């Protein structure tokens, strides 16, 4: 077992809560949006960013609801950037599977990426700390500029 796998194993209960919260945050009244998101979430990445949030929280205290809100926000922002990046780079395959724009089209992928970004900001608001919202917005700006 690699060190990263050991960390994932140690954080398994927190990661399970995180993934449940991500799915809840992305629930939509729109059937197509839910279909696209369900398909997208089946191809889970390493979740390094939320793992860093969870490890930091454990080091400095505890993993509570506010920490999970922040971890969800970070993961949603990251995924929004990946979805938008796939459109910009016209990438049709990521993690060995079709991207949203590869499976559907660029129009839908941009809207789904925006949906992820909007929900990242809402999760930032849920932390109750305006600095979290500011950080998400700033990171979003930097990601956009970096893509140019």
What are these regions (language model features)?
Residues 1-23:
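N-terminal amphipathic/basic leader segments beginning at the initiator methionine
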